[in-house]
Structure formats: C-alpha cells, structure tokens
Amino acid sequence: MAATTLYNSCLLQPKYGFTTRRLNQSLVNSLTNPTRVSVLWKSRRDVIAKASIEMAESNSISSVVVNSSGPIIVIDNYDSFTYNLCQYMGELGCHFEVYRNDELTVEELKRKKPRGLLISPGPGTPQDSGISLQTVLELGPLVPLFGVCMGLQCIGEAFGGKIVRSPFGVMHGKSSMVHYDEKGEEGLFSGLSNPFLVGRYHSLVIEKDSFPSDELEVTAWTEDGLVMAARHRKYKHIQGVQFHPESIITTEGKTIVRNFIKLVEKKESEKLA
C-alpha cells in the first residue's frame, strides 16, 4: 500500500485508470498486507450508523486526535476526476495525501490524524466504494468531510438514504442551474451566485422519498427537484455535492473547494481555542 503526498503542485489530468503511483509524485508511508474492510449495512443500516457515530465520538480524544500537522486525505474511488480536485487543492496551497479506497483501512486512516477528508467521485454505487462508507460514519463526526458525486451518495446511504437511478436519466457532461440555501451560514456555497451553473456526471441520486431528513438537510437542488447537495444536521462539517466542482462546466467550482478548505481551518481553530 502506498500514499501520495501532494503540496502546491500542478497535476495533468490523467486518463481513466491511472494510479497515484504513475503520477510524478513521491510515495510515502508504505505498509504491507493492508487489511481489506468489509462494509455491511444493507440491513439495520440506521443501527450501524448510530453505533459507528457513538464510537467515533467516544474515541475522539484518545485515538483520533486531530492536529494541524495532519494532511487533508483524499479517498480516491478510482476516478480520473479525483486529480482535477487535487489540482484545485494544490493551487490553493493545501497539503494533502491521496489513497485509493482499498489501499488502507479506516483504522490506518485514523492513525494519520487527517485535518479533513475528501471522498471522490467514482463508478458504481456506494457499496463499491471501499472504505468510503465506513469513513463517513467513523471519521465524519470528527473532522470536516467533503463528498463529491459518489461521495455525496456515500453520505446519503451511510445515514439511511437510498441510492437510486435518476428519474431523468444519465447526466454525463450536462450542465444544470443549481439553487442553494445554507440558511445564512458559512458553507460550501458561501460567496457563490444563486443559482449557479454546474457540470453533472452521474446516473444515480439520493432518492427523494427516502432522504434521511432526520440526519441530513438538503442544501442545494436542481430546478427539477433533485438533491444536488446535503450536509449533516448535527455535524455540519459533513457536506457533499452531487455535481462536479472540478468540472470546467462548473463556473465557481474552485470557490467551493476553497470554502471546504476554509471549513477545515475553522474547525482546527475551534479545537485550539
């Protein structure tokens, strides 16, 4: 298993299927025989989510102490768009590391003491996302977490929602106007136009009828009513978007990534206060 440490760097967009090892970056923290994590919440999902969050809260001081020296960790769900997100973070001066979703366990991830987490887009469903679902549940309550496309779907499923085919079909490279409401609070869309233009690359969405409104709140939507962003009601630093902020179609996408980094910095300052 290997990770890639990234600083201010300009990354070329790789073709689909490139791995972190094939980019011109330094490899660090090599570990042998990583344990694969099986995520089991097709049944009793709400019970597992509640138990995982309670465990995360109880361990927040002893085993998952967050400090400013840790990186933002990107969980790559085998998607080339991950590197566009990385490029934005590099341009914004962010120190981060990238791991494929089967390169390390959640326990290994905790030991890295991340400042924040980004769950990338990817093919398939949240059940195909390796450690992403478990990461949302166990680390989401502790550090800022930003899910993009499949990352938002992982947030939705982790907290009890159902991921279904979009009633409007496949949206691949399509543009939409997105409206948002963060209730006057600073969030991912702070400073953006309302509505704003986004690029969409997905066929799945969080089902409207099963949306876990007791746990999550919708913060952005399309004109036809599909959920385009959500955040946790209690842990407002758990946020995700269905569209792609790194797409050239998304006119203010870099601002969204910058707002996530600001959220990480704000959370750190609160811990130090």
Swiss-Prot record:
The active site is formed by C149, H244, E246
**A GO cellular component annotation in the UniProt record:** chloroplast
- The answer to keyword Transit peptide applying to this record is yes
Q: Is Transmembrane helix one of the keywords UniProt gives this record? A: no
Organelle transit peptide residues? 1-36
User: What are the alphabetically sorted keywords of the record?
Assistant: Amino-acid biosynthesis, Aromatic amino acid biosynthesis, Chloroplast, Glutamine amidotransferase, Lyase, Plastid, Transit peptide, Tryptophan biosynthesis
Any inhibitors or activators noted?
A: Feedback inhibition by tryptophan.
Return the PANTHER family for the record.
MULTIFUNCTIONAL TRYPTOPHAN BIOSYNTHESIS PROTEIN, MULTIFUNCTIONAL TRYPTOPHAN BIOSYNTHESIS PROTEIN-RELATED
Descriptive protein name: Anthranilate synthase beta subunit 2, chloroplastic
